[in-house]
Regions:
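Short connector loops at helix/strand junctions that flank enzyme active sites
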Residues: 19, 38-40, 68-70
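Conserved beta-strand core positions
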Residues: 24, 41-43, 73
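Metal-dependent nucleotidyltransferase catalytic core
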Residues: 8, 47-78
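Catalytic metal-binding acidic patch
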Residues: 28, 33-52
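A generic local structural motif
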Residues: 10-12, 29-31, 61-62
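Helical scaffold of the NTase/Pol beta-like nucleotidyltransferase catalytic core
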Residues: 1-24
Length: 78
């Protein structure tokens, strides 16, 4: 399935809120409108001001985002 940007936003918003994430930015093929069925979803997440510093907490965020999207993701945090 290929999601619209709106669908991605709706799926990740509850997860971002749960973790206190300041902002999530979409980049890559989905942001360019070039996504294919096999495309992953590339996300940059602003975790400043949160307690998301340990590998365990970042792994939980990754898993929850991937579960919400039901597609593989690439996650970059700042």
């Amino acid at each position: 399935m290929i999601y619209s940007i709106y669908e991605i936003q709706q799926r990740i918003a509850p997860v971002a809120k749960q973790y206190g994430v300041k902002a999530v930015f979409l980049f890559g093929s989905y942001a360019r409108g070039e996504a294919r069925e096999d495309s992953d979803i590339d996300l940059l997440v602003d975790t400043s001001g949160t307690n998301l510093r340990s590998l365990l907490s970042l792994g939980a965020l990754y898993c929850d985002l991937e579960a919400a999207l039901q597609k593989p993701i690439d996650l970059i945090t700042v």
